[in-house]
Structure formats: C-alpha cells, structure tokens
C-alpha cells in the first residue's frame, strides 16, 4: 500500500510497518514504553523515545497540525497541544525525552494502529508508538522525533538499566531514595563520604505532573534531572 511518498504494510499483529520512504527501504522498530532490549543490530540506527529507525523524524513544534493514517485508510487530523514523557533502553543506552502529543478520545484511538505513519502536510514526520490514558475518554498520542525546541531529551549509558519508581505524595527525591523533605538533606550529606567505587544506578521517579531522573554511585547522587510528566506507561509493566 502507498500514501504520499511511503509504502507500508500491515503485519500479522495488526500493526503498520513502513517499508519504503522515497523508494528507499526503511527500518522502523517500535518499542513498548520503558522497554529494555539487547540487540546490537539496532545500534546502527537513529533512536528517539519509543522507536529505533533508519528515518530521521524531524523536529516539530507545539500546536502543529498533523495527520495520522487510520485503519480504514483515511487521514485523521489532530493538533499537538500537550506533552508527555517516554523512554526506552537499547543495549544499555537510555533514550528519553518529553514529546509533543495530541489528545484523542476512545473512538479515535480505536481507529489507530501502532506503527501508523504521521504526517505534517504530506511529509512523514513520525509513527504512532503508544497511547497513554489520562481520562475516561481521553488519551495522549505522543509524537516522537527530534526534540521539540521547548522540551528536554537526552541519552546516557546505563550499565545496570533504569529502575522506575512511583513518586509518593509528600516525598522528596535524592539519589536512589525518596524521603520526607525534612530528612532528605541529612541523607544527602551522609552520602558525601561514601566510597566512589560503589555500583552505578539510574532511577526514574514519576508522578502525573513531573519526572525525576537520578544517576548515582551507591546512594550518592551524581546527576538529578527534572522534567514535566506524565510518564507514558505500558499496559504490561507495573511500576511500583
């Protein structure tokens, strides 16, 4: 099947697979939100949160109008008016970022397949990688690609993977732990003299409105990032 400058097919799992762009063979491998994979062949491709691809998905700006291929072959028009956070880990490379997102209702979501091409005008700009429920009849559809100018993205080597932990109410975050605010400073000071040869770790703390990422040696915090949420969560993994 063809649309604009792409050729695509539907695989046995009912997902859309982009086969060619501008008559050049394409590779697009979609990852579950938070998924960790070990496959050295994937390292040769571009990576954006939720996807490994031979295609460079361009930078978009908030409020861009996009068109998404629906299951009946028509194009659904949506607006990038929200943001969300997604990540994956590929060969110990932690790829993460805030992504522009469109809001869809239940009826629209049922018309969309994972892998469906996303266009701005007639140009391919991304693919459908996930959905995130934010209300009874409201979902976020993230649009992955080069970082939107006002958002944050990044990647880092994580030798021991990424631990994901729900950020509990009335807690503050330092390193690998969350504690009440009146205890967190003392805990941080106690880590100053700990051994620098301790095990490295990366922890992602999340709540609906905010994401924290820490990189640590033992309980000593080396880096601490703050970003807006929500975290796109897979249906098959429970984050404690």
Swiss-Prot record:
Active site residues per record: 46, 181, 185
InterPro entries linked: Poxin_vir
EC class: hydrolase
Keywords recorded for this protein, A-Z: Hydrolase, Nuclease
Keyword Nuclease: yes
Record Pfam families: Baculo_p26
Gene Ontology MF term list: 2',3'-cyclic GMP-AMP binding; nuclease activity
Cell membrane among keywords: no
Coiled coil: none
Domain of life: Viruses
Residues of the site described as Substrate binding: 93, 146, 226
Catalytic activity as recorded in UniProt: 2',3'-cGAMP + H2O = Gp(2'-5')Ap(3') + H(+)
Enzyme Commission numbers on file: 3.1.-.-
Function per UniProt: Nuclease that cleaves host 2',3'-cGAMP.
Subunit structure, interactors included: Homodimer.
Notes concerning its domains: The substrate binding site is formed by the N-terminus of a monomer and the C-terminus of the opposite monomer.
Similarity annotation: Belongs to the poxin family.
This protein's name: Poxin
UniProt organism field: Autographa californica nuclear polyhedrosis virus
Taxonomic lineage from the root: Viruses, Viruses incertae sedis, Naldaviricetes, Lefavirales, Baculoviridae
Record gene name: P26
């Amino acid at each position: 099947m063809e649309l604009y400058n792409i050729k695509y097919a539907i695989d046995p799992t009912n997902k859309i697979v982009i086969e060619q762009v501008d008559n050049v063979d394409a590779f697009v491998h979609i990852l579950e939100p938070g998924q960790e994979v070990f496959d050295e062949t994937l390292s040769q491709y571009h990576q954006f949160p939720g996807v490994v691809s031979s295609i460079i998905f361009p930078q978009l700006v908030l409020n861009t109008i996009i068109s998404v291929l629906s299951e009946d072959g028509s194009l659904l028009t949506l607006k990038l008016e929200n943001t969300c956070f997604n990540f994956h880990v590929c060969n110990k490379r932690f790829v993460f970022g805030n992504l522009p997102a469109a809001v869809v209702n239940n009826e629209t979501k049922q018309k969309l397949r994972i892998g469906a091409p996303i266009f701005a005008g007639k140009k391919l700009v991304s693919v459908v990688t996930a959905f995130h429920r934010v209300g009874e009849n409201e979902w976020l559809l993230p649009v992955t690609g080069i970082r939107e100018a006002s958002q944050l993205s990044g990647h880092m080597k994580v030798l021991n993977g990424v631990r994901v932990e729900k950020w509990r109410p009335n807690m503050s975050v330092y390193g690998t732990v969350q504690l009440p605010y009146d205890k967190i400073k003392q805990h941080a000071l106690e880590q100053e003299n700990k051994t620098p040869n301790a095990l490295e770790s990366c922890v992602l703390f999340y709540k609906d409105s905010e994401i924290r990422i820490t990189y640590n040696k033992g309980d000593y915090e080396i880096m601490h990032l703050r970003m807006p949420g929500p975290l796109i969560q897979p249906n098959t993994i429970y984050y404690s």
